[in-house]
């Protein structure tokens, strides 16, 4: 996978065959960062991190810090290996259950979540993620197209992928 924009444009991050995740497609990633616009100096939380491409792209585009949370040891090992390419960047790693992490986390400017396909606790995830946002923060959920119990302020669809956005305020 390749970084599309910013200081690390063109840099390739390693992925694994038969990975326990599905990376965000190039088109969805470009659209996400076009929507967010300037993320310079912001801190971002990447839940269900998988390949980490969203967090690494955010760093390349000027994010101040990225925090990866994934419960898989294999995923965390790959994230740490890829982070070596991003020298001197502030990157945090947590091998943890997302809900346990959200109970005690700091606040973030952006929280991105791309849960597994058959994840059935999205309605539980949304309010917990929103509660960990800074006052003007945005929570972004990547999923298959669907509706949620908490109304978002924006929804963008890309074939069988949907980006749904919630603001704290």
Where do the protein language model's features map onto the residues?
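Class I S-adenosyl-L-methionine-dependent methyltransferase catalytic core
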Residues: 1-169
